[in-house]
Amino acid sequence: MLKLLIADDEKTIRETIRSFIDWEALDIEVVGTAKDGIEAYNMILDLYPDIVLTDIRMPGLSGLELIEKMYEINKDMQFIILSGYNEFEYAKTAMQYGVRHYLLKPCSEQQIINSIREIKQDYQIRMAQKNILAEHDQLKNQFYTSMLINIVNHYLAQGSDLTPEQEDSFYTEYRRHFGNAR
């Protein structure tokens, strides 16, 4: 379940968004609402939401300032901007920080839901990619370890010119690194 924070200086908008959308059906947990940019910033640092739905103009920090600050900390956090301002400069600045969802007020419930679904889909793809990369790294390490063990075992099977002391030291180090894999 992804976590969502709603930030808007208008109480009616915060409450409407929180109550009219069936967040549970979207597998989203609304972790809080913030009445200004500073409160939103502090809540983000405390609650680590995956998605922040924010107004563009708020007291304390604007939505753009909030996005900029959070971008420095967590580039994976996703933002949906709700704005009453149809100004290209706002959207352009937001896009520089990875924001892909800029909704004009008044927007419909369905527009918010569509943005949430897109973000969720992108999130699932990113997580799948991270898991594949982690699995790849693990398999690569297992492969190299197995290759090294096989090379060493082949060398030992051919016989060596090691003294008994050197052989004991070698086997001690071998077991330390590879266990009893012989």
Q: Which ranges hold each PLM region?
A:
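Residue-level detector of secondary-structure boundary/capping sites
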Residues: 8, 25, 139-143
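Interdomain helical linkers/hinges and coiled-coil/dimerization scaffolds
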Residues: 107-182
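Generic detector of well-ordered alpha-helical packing
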Residues: 9-11, 56
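Two-component/phosphorelay signaling modules centered on CheY-like receiver
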Residues: 11-32
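CheY-like receiver
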Residues: 23, 38-139
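Conserved sequence signature across two-component system core domains
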Residues: 7-8, 34, 52
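Extreme N-terminal starter segment of soluble prokaryotic enzymes
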Residues: 1-4
